Amino acid sequence: MDEDRFNMSVRKFLKKVGVTSQRVIEEAVRSGAVKGDVLKVRMTLTAENAPIEHVIEDDIAVR
């Protein structure tokens, strides 16, 4: 395995996930779709060809 190539691929994927997720969250908050002061979020990472299922849950203060 080429460590440098692997690390760059992972970073590129995570950057894409982070940027697009932030946009979706901001859009939901700005549109008024969030009820209450906290947005409860969950991100699930899965892979088609590997036994990966990783869940991250958190609260985001919106007001």
Model segments located where?
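N-terminal acidic leader/helix
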Residues: 1-19
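Short, conserved loop-to-beta-strand elements that form functional interface hotspots
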Residues: 21-27
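N-terminal intrinsically disordered, cationic/polar leader segments
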Residues: 2-8, 27-30, 34-63
